[in-house]
Amino acid sequence: MIVFSDMDGTLLTSDNQMSDATWAMLDELARRGIEFVPCTGRPLSGIFEPILAHPAVHYAVCANGASVWQLDDGTPTDTSRATRILSRPLDRAIAHRVHSIAAGHDVTFDIFADGQCFLPRSLYTRLDEFCGGDPHIAASLKRTRTPIDMDIDSKIDEVETLERIAMYWHDPADRDAIAAELDTLGGIEVTRSYAMNIEVMGEGATKGTALTWLCEHLGERLADAWAFGDNINDIPMLQAAGHGMAMINAEPEDREAADAITEYDNDHDGVARTIMAALA
C-alpha cells in the first residue's frame, strides 16, 4: 500500500487545518511502514512543515506533478535540502508566450519554480480580489507565494527549473479568452485546482504521471496505490491509482473518474476514515 493525497479540499479542512484524526492516520501509516505522499499543486515550500516532518512522509509530488521531491532524512522540513528526483519542466519560451497571452487580461501570474512560487508584488497585494470571496483561499495563496519586485519575463529567465504557471481570474470573460489561446499552444498541460484559476504545466506533467513514476521508483504496484482528490487537477492520479478516491465534496468530473467516493468530506476526515477502514 502507498497513499497519495491532494492537500487543499482533500486532506486539509476548509480552513487549511489538519485534524486529529488525520494525524492519527499518518501515525498509523508510519507504524506500518506505509508511505504517505502529499500530491499537490503547491510548491514544495508550500507544504506545511509538520507534514514534511512526519515519519510517514519521505516524498512529495508538487506543482501538479512537475516535480517529485525526496525529502532530506535529517532535516525534512528544510526544503532547500530536498532532492528533486523527477522533473517535467515547463519550457521557458512557452512560459513567455503564456505571459504574453495573460498580459492582456486582469489576472494574476504565478511562477512556480525551484520548489517555490513567485508573484509580482503588484498582484500579490490584490490576491483577495481573485479568491471568490473565500478568506481561507486568500490566506493560503498569500502563505504559499513570495512577492517579487522584478518583471515576470525576467523572473522566468532567472529561475533554474520552471515548474508551472497559474493565473487567477475574477471575470469569466478573461478565463475564456485565455483558455481559447492556450488551446492553440502545444507542449503544455492545462488544468485547474480552483474554480477561479488556470494552471499550465509542461507536456506530460500531471499528478497521474508523477504517481505512476514514483510507484515504479519505489517498487510499489499501481494496484496497491490509493489516491485522494477533489478537483480537476486530481483526475489523472485518480485514474492512475488502483484505488482512485474522489472526495464526496469533489467536482462532478472527479467523482465520475474515480473508482469510489469517500463517505465523508474534507471537513469530516474523509481521507483518514477511508484509510483507517482499509487498514482495519
List the predicted regions and their residue ranges:
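Mg2+-dependent phosphoryl-transfer enzymes with acidic/Ser/Thr/Gly-rich catalytic loops
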Residues: M1-I2, M18-S19, D183, I198-A280
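Non-catalytic pre-domain segments flanking phosphatase-related domains
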Residues: M1-M7, A24-D27, R31, E220
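Short, structured coil segments at secondary-structure junctions
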Residues: A53-A56, A63-N64, L185-G186, A240-A241, ...
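Conserved acidic, metal-coordinating active-site core of Asp-based
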Residues: H105-T108, F112-F228
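Active-site phosphate-binding/coordination module
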Residues: D20-G133
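Short, acidic loop-to-helix structural element flanking the phosphoryl-transfer center
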Residues: N16-R32, R88-A95, I148-D153, G202-E216
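Active-site metal-binding loops of divalent metal-dependent hydrolases
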Residues: M7, G65, G229-N231
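Asp-based phosphoryl-transfer active-site loop
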Residues: M1-N16, V98, L238
